[in-house]
Amino acid sequence: MWLKLFFLLLYFLVLFVLARFFEAIVWYETGIFATQLVDPVALSFKKLKTILECRGLGYSGLPEKKDVRELVEKSGDLMEGELYSALKEEEASESVSSTNFSGEMHFYELVEDTKDGIWLVQVIANDRSPLVGKIHWEKMVKKVSRFGIRTGTFNCSSDPRYCRRRGWVRSTLIMSVPQTSTSKGKVMLKEYSGRKIEVEHIFKWITAHAASRIKTIYNVEHLKEEWNKSDQYWVKIYLFANLDQPPAFFSALSIKFTGRVEFIFVNVENWNNKSYMTDIGIYNMPSYILRTPEGIYRYGNHTGEFISLQAMDSFLRSLQPEVNDLFVLSLVLVNLMAWMDLFITQGATIKRFVVLISTLGTYNSLLIISWLPVLGFLQLPYLDSFYDYSLRLLRYSNTTTLASWVRADWMFYTSHPALFLSTYLGHGLLIDYFEKKRRRSNNDEVNANNLEWLSSLWDWYTSYLFHPIASFQNFPVDSDWDEDPDLFLERLAFPDLWLHPLIPTDYIKNLPMWRFKCLGVQSEEEMSESSQDTENDSDSDNMDTFSSSKDIFEDKQSVVHSSPGRTSHCDTEACSCANKCESSPCERKRRSYGSHNTDEDMEPDWLTWPAGTLHCTECVVCLENFENGCLLMGLPCGHVFHQNCIVMWLAGGRHCCPVCRWPSYKKKQPYAQQQPLSNDVPS
């Protein structure tokens, strides 16, 4: 998780540097910055109208370019970044969707139950044509949608009873606006009563109703009273301008931030004495002033602070966020971090997506579970001071120059989603390259075959589904599945796969360990002479003995090789069992489990073996004989192996005996010990 968080922070740093790089390129090619002011005199009439469209100011009665330019200057300073965004938005030919209401409940759910937005609904009466034609309605939808106003069409033929109850007997336009200045207050419906069915007149009607909710100040005395008043609003934003009404984007934001930020419009059109504004620090007109308990902040002096809906919305959200804003932000960050697993995970393609889906589900579940106590914590009545200090910290941090850069980059990348996704993909491919290079340098095995990985995944699932998770030393002896079938059924009903994903290997250090010793060890020459004499003298006498030993050895090999899901031997070069020996080998002629005997001086010292172990002279993992001084290890089932061989076997995830498949961490009833008798072998 920390690795993914580091890569995500690194990605954000790359985005920040990339944005500065783009700014440098634009400055090198054009010699201008995004924060550089634009002189409206140098703009064409079309560009001036585009700026007014984005700010939400009507210009239908202004035929001259001079009047349009003055209206742009009265609404606020124009920056290069705002001009670029406005022209790009005007060139975009994307169609905006409009809702078609199916009936009363649909209308109530979206319009009347929505407390923090404006709706414009065209009602089409039965057997009547719509009030606004299709072409004009599409223009209307595109014009109002840039200010966050949602649109829809209600055809009375789908629910005539509701239309009669509402009194909609003719086609009309309905506008829904929050009635009170409190958050989630009541909604009032207003019907358009104008005679001119034109886009500009309808838009002026909408903006007039939206502006009526904003507190307007017309004289100095009212301004003094409002400026010195302290009420429930900690954050207030003032617009000092020489306009008849505030721009539409300002009115739309006042509805969106109802209950969080108070919007105040100061109309200085007929003011003769403006000395008081100088006293409170207002020197330029127009001015957007943010007043908080910490002081006054002049909006528009930093990077990305344009006179537009998107820029001011991003600015106010960072200062006075809702809990939903924080949740959405955390959701985006967590999912971006989870998607890093697609590039960090190495191996098969299916493996990458399986790990990705698992990570997405885990991270999102943990996020939702973590937010539940946070929501309950915020509703406690004794945390008002904590809430106030948190908002104050946000206001301090988000009014800095660095925060303005971050907001500007956020608007830039959200308006160019293809660039955002391509940089994320490139960053992920770089992570994948370096991670693959690191694993190759560490000689880590990477399984790139989908079928092999699926097979190993199935083996992993079945292994942990049926094997109990218990330590070797603490697991009771009498809890055997063979003796208690109910435990096996309970195991199937409640698997420990998602509760305990790994079997602990601490039990390995508790397994019995000792060295293989012979009662008498001869030199190599004597051993070879003795073996030759023994071979020549006992060809006829011990033929039955050797044949029976061969049969037992073949039976043992068939058992070992027929065990599913494991490797029955290891390479001679890789097995270091022979290097652990201290002296010459103790040759054996019979290699079966049980009691064995040859000459008395060649007999293994069985007394040094722990109780409950099966006597044998060969390791079935590497298929080599035990040699004098070799380190041995026994399993709970009683079978004995080279210590190095069985540790490698268990560390590879195969927690069972290579011979009988008994779990290596589970105790077993000891076998009846078979003591070797020297007089059992015929002479």
Curated annotation (Swiss-Prot):
GO molecular function, one term: zinc ion binding
Region (Disordered): 525-548
Zinc finger (RING-type) boundaries: 619-661
Catalytic activity as recorded in UniProt: S-ubiquitinyl-[E2 ubiquitin-conjugating enzyme]-L-cysteine + [acceptor protein]-L-lysine = [E2 ubiquitin-conjugating enzyme]-L-cysteine + N(6)-ubiquitinyl-[acceptor protein]-L-lysine
Organism of derivation: Mus musculus
Protein name: E3 ubiquitin-protein ligase RNF103
Cellular localisation: Endoplasmic reticulum membrane
Listed transmembrane segments: 6-26, 326-346, 366-386, 411-431
Cited function: Acts as an E2-dependent E3 ubiquitin-protein ligase, probably involved in the ER-associated protein degradation pathway.
SUPFAM superfamilies associated with the record: RING/U-box
Membrane topology reported for the UniProt record: Multi-pass membrane protein
Description of how the protein assembles with itself and partners: Interacts with DERL1 and VCP.
Keywords: Endoplasmic reticulum, Membrane, Metal-binding, Transferase, Transmembrane, Transmembrane helix, Ubl conjugation pathway, Zinc, Zinc-finger
Biological-process GO terms, alphabetical: ERAD pathway; protein ubiquitination
UniProt pathway: Protein modification; protein ubiquitination
Gene Ontology, cellular component aspect: endoplasmic reticulum; endoplasmic reticulum membrane
First and last residue of the signal peptide: none
Enzyme Commission number(s) of this protein: 2.3.2.27
Domain of life, per lineage: Eukaryota
Tissue/organ expression: Highly expressed in the normal cerebellum but not in the cerebral cortex.
UniProt-listed InterPro entries: RNF103 (IPR042494), Znf_RING (IPR001841), Znf_RING/FYVE/PHD (IPR013083)
Biased composition (Acidic residues): 525-542
